Amino acid sequence: MKLDRFINRPVLSTVISVLIVILGIIGLATLPVTQYPDIAPPTVQVRATYTGANSTAVLNSVIAPLEDQINGVENMMYIQSSASNNGAADINVYFNQGTDPDMAAVNVQNRVSMAQGLLPAEVTKVGVTTQKRQNSMLMVFSLYDETDSYNIEFIENYANINLIPEIKRVKGVGDANVLGQDYSMRIWLKPDVMAQYKLVPTDVSAALAEQNIEAAPGQFGERGNQTFQYTIRYKGRLQQTTEFEDIVIKALPDGNVLRLGDVADIELGRLAYTFNNMVNGHKAVSCIVYQMAGSNATETISNLEEVLAKAQESLPTGLNINIAQNANDFLFASIHEVIKTLIEAFILVFIVVYIFLQDMRSTLIPAIAIPVALVATFFVLKLIGFSVNLLTLSAMVLAIAIVVDDAIVVVEGVHAKLDQGYKSSREASIDAMSELGGAIVSITLVMMSVFIPVSFMGGTAGTFYRQFGITMAISIGFSALNALTLSPALCAIFLKPHDEGHGAKKMTRVERFHTAFNAAYDSILKKYKKHVVFFIHKKWLSFGLVAASIILLVFFMKVTPTGMVPNEDTGTIMGAVTLPPGTSQERAMEILNRVDSLVAAEPAVDSRTVISGFGFIGGQGPSYGSIIIKLKDWEERSMMQNSDIVVGTLFMRAQKIIKDAQVLFFAPPMIPGYSASSDIELNMQDKTGGDLNHFYDVVLDYMDALKARPEINSAQTTFNPNFPQYMLDIDAAACKKAGISPSDILTTMQGYFG
C-alpha cells in the first residue's frame, strides 16, 4: 500500500486513528490501576493454633511437621515460619514469580493434609487453614466507640457479624481479618470447689459434650392411619448463661445434683483475650483487608469505601468507622501528580513546537498526534497484561517528547516542499512522504530497539524496566503509525501554500515576536557554531572533556545513593512496640497508651490506631503492639511535616520518654508484598541446630555490629527466647502410685490454665 493513499483518502486515515483511540479508551477503562506492577512473589499462608502451648512446643509439634511436608512443593522459592507464646503458628510459603496462586494454594493444602496425622489433636480440632493472598494491606479500618458506652465484646461481635461478611464479598478482596475475637461462653472453673467434689476439668468437658449438643430425634406419624405427621425438635446447643449454669455435672449422694454453676463462674465473653484496639483513645476493633492477586486496587478500595459508607448509616449510636490506611490515598495523589505532569509536558511541547514552527496550523498536527499515540498505547497494555501504574504513566510523560518528533518531521518535510514553490499542499505532502516514509520507519525501529531489549530482563528490576521500556516502545510505534497515516493527511488539509507577498503586510504582535525570536535564535546559533569550530580545532580539549565526563559519571554513580524506588510520603506511618518478655496485657496497654499520647501530641497526625497483641514486624502476644498513624492531607502539612521528619521526631521522643519498651516508627513499604517497612529486613538462620539462647547472643552481637556502622540509624529485632516460663516437672513414679498418669495432670492443667 502506497502512503499517498492515506493522503488522497483522509477519511481512511481519520478512521484508523479514531479506531485505535476507541480501543485505547476501552483498554484504559478496563486496565487494573496500581502503584507499581505486581512483583511480589505469590504467597500461601498456613495458620494453626495450639491453645495453651508456648513457642517451643508450637515449633516442635506444629511447625516442624508442617514444614517437613510443605517443603519442596512445586515452584516453591522459600518458606518462612513463626511461633508465638500464645500458641499461634504462621507459615508463609513463597513461590516463584508467575506461579498460579490458586494451584499453589491447592498444592500446599495437599501437603498440609499429609501432615494432619502428625499434629496434636488440639490443633486439628481447631483446624489448620490454608489461604492465598497478597501480603500487602489494601486497607485498615476500625470500628470504634466515640461515646465509650459499649464494651469491647459487643464492638468485636458487631464487626464480625455485620461488617466482615460484607467486606469479604467485595470483588478484589483476598482476605479480611478482624484483630479481635468472637463472642464465646467463658467457663471459669473454681479449683477449690472442684476439689471438694473430687472433679477434674475432663468431667466438665464430658458433661458439656453430653448436654450441649445438636440432635435429630426424628419424626412420628410417617406411616399408619394418621391424620398428621410431626417432626421432633430438640432445643440444640445452649445459648444463655443460665442454660450453661444448669448443666448437670453429677448426682450427689443426698439426692441433689451438682450443676456447672456450682463449680464455675460463667459469663459471655471473648474467645481469647489476645488483642486490644484503640482509635484516638477510644475502644475499637481493627480490621485488615488484603488484596486478591491481579485485582484492580482502585476499584476494590472504591467498592470497600461504598460498603463502609453504607454500613456507617446503620451503625448503633456512638459507633463510627475510621479508615486508618487506604492505599488509594497515596495512589490517587501519585497518579494525580503524574497526570498533572503529563498535561504540563503536553502543554510545554505544544508551546515549543509552536514557537519553532511559528504556525498554528502546523502546530495542531503534532498536537493531535500526541494524544492519539498515547491513548492507543493503553489498548496494547491491556493485551499484554500490564496495568496503569506510576511506571507506565511516567513512560508516557517521557514518550510525549519522542512521539511528537515523527509528526514534526512530517510537517517540516511538507513545509520544505512548500518553500520550494509547491502550490498544492496535497502534492507537497505526497512528495514529502515519498522521501520521509523510509526514514520514519527506520528511526522508529532504531528507537524501539533501544527499549525492547529490556523486556528480556528477569527479576524484580526486570519487571520494572519491562513495563517502562515496552510502554515507551509501544508509544513510539503508534507515533510512527500516525506519521505514516494521519499526519500527512492533516498536512494536506491544514497547511496552505506560502504567500509570497506576505512581507508587504503590517506585522502583527505575534509575527513581531516570531521575528525577534528568530533573530535571537540566529544569534545563539552563530555563537554555537563558533564554539563548535573551536572544539574542532582543539581536538585534545574535546577528548579531555569526554574523559572527564566519564570520570565524573563513574564517581557520581559510586557516591549517589541507590535503591529500587524512591521513598515517598505516603501519608501513613507505622509503629512497632516491643515490650519486655512476659509483659502482662494490662502493663502492655499502659505503655501503649503512653506511646499513643506521644503520637497525639504531633500536630501533623490526623488519627491514630493502637493495636495490642499484634506486631507488624513479627510476633503476637501481650509483648507486641502496633500503631497506625494517619497523617493529615498533604496540602494541610508543611514541608517540615513530611513523613520522614515526623518519623524521626516521633522516634527521638519515644527514645527519651519510653524507657521500658522498644518503639520503632517507619514508613510503609513503597513496593508492597516484600516487607512490612521500607527499611532493610534481615532473617538469620541457625544451621548448627544449637541452643536458642546461644543463637540469641549471636543475633545481639550482629545487631551491635550493625549499630556500629555509620549508615545504620537503628537496628531492632523482635526475636527473644527469654520469655519467663515455669517448668512443669512431673514425677511419673508418684503418678503411678496415685493411680493417675502424667497426661491426666497435663490435661487438668490445660483445663485450668489453657
Short names for language-model regions:
Residues A324, L331, I335, V411, ...:
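Helix-loop junctions and hydrophobic alpha-helical segments within the transmembrane domains
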Residues A272-S295:
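Small-residue transmembrane helix packing/gating motifs
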Residues V11, L19-A57, M77, S113-V123, ...:
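Transmembrane helices with small-residue packing motifs
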Residues M1-V33, L436, K506-V565:
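Signature of alpha-helical transmembrane segments and their immediate interfacial
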Residues G24-T30, Q35, Q45, I347-A416, ...:
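Hydrophobic transmembrane alpha-helices and their membrane-interface caps
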Residues T14, V21, I25-I26, T30, ...:
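Surface-exposed amphipathic alpha-helical segments in non-transmembrane regions
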